[in-house]
Amino acid sequence: MKGLRLPESMREELAKPHGKLYRGKGEKLLLEVEEISEAKPFCTVGDLVTASAIKVGLTPDLAVADGKTLREENVEFEQEAFDEVIETTNPPAHISCELISALLKALKLCEDGKKVLVFVDGEEDLAVVPLVKLLPLGALILYGQPGEGVVALKVDEEKKVLILNLLNKMEIIGECDELKYLLGGD
């Protein structure tokens, strides 16, 4: 598997919320996230956040999910809410070249007005990292903060610089064109 591996030393830094934390539980919490209305595109990472968004009528332009929450229980949501489903693989604590490729394909489809689900065999948690780098300024990523609520991460120049610094600290476990693009291209 080619891509990036998260070193143990970075796990604590990436576990912190990197956006505005909305505390609470349940679908109604998403209705409090005022950033959704102005975000283009609006993205979710994680099954519970994606399922909750769909339930309250806020189907994301791009969702990344793996069918599980906290790596255990299955979470079901309406895949029919999406125009396209792209399947990919990504091991825990990695950003695989396959995941980067799937995200790039999904973003092209989103540009054409399609709603896209990237379904990951493995783990989707770290998808937030490449998404910040790949999404345009003004995009919004919602992801779960275990035991606390939902994080609304608005993509801006500051976040892009932060993420590029984090990406460059990760361990390269095999190069691919998508990885070169992620680390250096814009």
UniProtKB/Swiss-Prot annotation:
Its EC number is 2.7.1.237. The keyword Nucleotide-binding applies. GO terms for biological process: coenzyme A biosynthetic process. InterPro entries: GTP-dep_dephospho-CoA_kin (IPR007164). GTP binds at residues 47-49, 66, 68, 124. It is an enzyme of class 2 (transferase). It catalyses: 3'-dephospho-CoA + GTP = GDP + CoA + H(+). The keyword Kinase applies. Keywords: Coenzyme A biosynthesis, GTP-binding, Kinase, Nucleotide-binding, Transferase. One of its GO terms (molecular function) is kinase activity. Pathway: Cofactor biosynthesis; coenzyme A biosynthesis. Pfam families: DUF359. Belongs to the GTP-dependent DPCK family. Catalyzes the GTP-dependent phosphorylation of the 3'-hydroxyl group of dephosphocoenzyme A to form coenzyme A (CoA). This is GTP-dependent dephospho-CoA kinase. It comes from Archaeoglobus fulgidus (strain ATCC 49558 / DSM 4304 / JCM 9628 / NBRC 100126 / VC-16).
